[in-house]
Amino acid sequence: MGKIPLVYKCNSRNAAAMRRHHWSIMHMSDDAMIAPQHFALNTPALRTLRPKLRAATKSGIVIHTDEITEWPTLHQIDQDWQNTHGAARGGTIGRFEIGYLSTHFIACAEHHGRQCAFVTFQKRRNEWCLDVMRHTSEMPDSTMHALVHSAITAAKEQG
């Protein structure tokens, strides 16, 4: 078998309970939390993001956040990404599965008429959670920054 259980997104109270039951506990990461209603590009903390977004715009990247119908294209981008980066493990970043992703917010990047990247966010009642990020090797620099920024903007607009 060679498999061990893993608890993902565990809070400190649950970790303490597992420790009492002799589980080994290891902190792996912290979530980056952004409050979209307070997000503003003109703040000093985002001074390095502004040039990235300008570079994406200058490169001709167009971001689409409307309903996704190009599932075969997104699947091909996922396959290209896996060929370059290795198989998706489905741990902290999700896997490409249409039934699963069809419930997500999806932002796609297009460059010279071809889709080159996308990001997906799980939408929950009070939060959006970045899940899948994929791109081709031909993606212009700063494209992923522009995709995440478009999702933050959409979350802000949707309240």
What are these regions (language model features)?
Residues K3-D31, Q37-P51, A55-G159:
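A conserved beta-strand-loop-helix scaffold within acyl/acetyltransferase catalytic domains
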